[in-house]
Amino acid sequence: MSRFYYSILVAGVLLKIVAIPDASYGAELAPVQQSIHQQERQRALEERLAPPTPDVRLSAPSAFFSRIIFPLETPCFVINRIKISGAEPLPRWLPLQRIADQAQGQCLGAKGINLLMSQMQNRLVDHGYVTTRVLAPQQDLNSGTLALNVVPGKIRGVELTPDSNRYVTLFSAFPARAGTLLDLRDIEQGLENLQRVPTVQANMVLIPGSAPGETDIILNWQQRKMWRLAASLDDSGTRSTGRYQGGATLFLDNPLSLSDLFYVSAGGALQRRGDKGTNNLTGHYSLPFGYWTAGMTASRYDYYQAVAGLNGDINYRGESENVAFQLSRLLHRNASQKTTFTYDVLTRSSKNYINDTEVEVQRRRTSAWRIGLQHRHFISQAILDAGISYQRGTRWFGAIPAQEEYFGEATALSKILRLNAQLDIPFVVMAQNLHYNLQYQRQSTNTPLTPQDQFSIGGRWSVRGFNGERTLIADRGWWVRNDIGWYLPLPGHELYVGVDYGEVGGRSGAYLLGRHLAGSAVGVRGNVLNTRYDLFAGKPLSKPNGFKTDSLAVGFNLNWLY
């Protein structure tokens, strides 16, 4: 098909769909806007349904390790060499020898030797080896050599308490194994894996074994029930397909005794009529294995609307399907931070119909892979989350070129770099508990993107204060959200105010009404009668001329869980 005929066909289709009288700007939403709006709703849904990852921290963050200052003692012995034995089972990167070498050339007495051993012991504890000991055997220090023995702390066994439930597989979820070094990080990871299922509670105690350095790990594992039900209600839909959206979710917790999680969620527009409506279905399954987690999420969405055409109403319908395979591994953790590597494979397809006839030029089938790093850092009482990811479009799984590729306008073989960060800082003012929350997202690319991969701002999931019926969309962009929340005297409830700002740019930026939005929000959220709620109102602070939106954007989210 030549570019001329392609342009004529697309122009004819889009003219019928988006040629809307100015007075009814919010009545109908263009297909691109509808698709992006649904992607944001789906992303928010999956984030809400995913259980929060528990943070198990069994030891306090270590103090800064400085150079040892040895005391002056009498009598003392000049130490020329420090010999460490028994450290072979420990990782080679542990700086025990480097710490010990600080004693070279020093004249040490009993206090100095104990100080050296204490510093080495503290470093072992800081790295999680809490039952490994550093000992000084009887020796003659007149030789100038100080001998130190490391007694590795090992696990004799991992057992459940007699009153624990038995429907759990420790081998896959708990990386600490009998016969291996006792590492507190392995235990923390195992407890997080066991408690990733919200209906499970797990804790442990360490009991010394009969042999030196041996320890038994005794776990108490309880599961209240294996299923949960959830229902949701919000007004996050669009006027063209139904503003009020409802949904129901069935969770199966630990169905295969692998600390696994499964859910299926269905929903759609509540005020469904013959001329407009939405339907969505999402399924998810994931399970941990030691420091690894694997999962799969699949979703299907369709919407329909009657669009006013030149010669009568036109029935427009869209369908989309998404499948994501997820694999992650925790690379590093200590008492105050952890870093996770993620790898995703994504597929997406969509079709659009006019009066039950497919618009073939709008058919899309794409695939991509994505790698990323996620980091969490506990800084005193504050929590910092930061992440970076790189996404590359592929031709896997029958993916087809985007129509824009034939004319060099865009490509499904995208290269996208994304950054995200969140900082939450609690503080107290006049005996009142408050917190400041900062969120930041950025997307960068050097390839022209199809609309489904572009960055959008304006709405409850990006720059608040806008109703989401219209957004600014481009290849690149960023937004920042600032909230100050006040924990009300009534437990479980919070009042918050926020100010947001965002910008977009890139290839399509020249065709937009503007490049930036700023908005504000005020709301109250909390939990009552097993229902999480969020009631809010927002107002635009800055927008381009001609960018039409409500002067006041109000909304709500209700999520009930049983």
Swiss-Prot record:
Listed GO MF terms: porin activity; protein transmembrane transporter activity
Q: Which PROSITE patterns match?
A: POTRA (PS51779)
Q: Where in the cell is it found?
A: Cell outer membrane
Gene Ontology cellular component annotations, sorted alphabetically: cell outer membrane; pore complex; type V protein secretion system complex
An annotated GO BP: monoatomic ion transport
Write down the Pfam families for this protein, in alphabetical order.
POTRA_2 (PF08479), POTRA_3 (PF17287), ShlB (PF03865)
Domain of life, per lineage:
Bacteria
Q: Which residues form the POTRA domain?
A: 77-153
Keywords on record: Cell outer membrane, Ion transport, Membrane, Porin, Protein transport, Transmembrane, Transmembrane beta strand, Transport
Q: Tell me, in one coarse class, where this protein mainly resides.
A: membrane
Which InterPro entries does the record match to this protein? Hemolysn_activator_HlyB_C, Polypept-transport_assoc_ShlB, POTRA, ShlB_POTRA, TPS, TPS_OM_transporter
**Chain's role:** Potential outer membrane protein component of a toxin-immunity protein module, which functions as a cellular contact-dependent growth inhibition (CDI) system. CDI modules allow bacteria to communicate with and inhibit the growth of closely related neighboring bacteria in a contact-dependent fashion. This protein may be required for secretion and assembly of the CdiA toxin protein.
Hey, which family's this protein in? Belongs to the TPS (TC 1.B.20) family.
Q: What is this protein called?
A: Outer membrane transporter CdiB
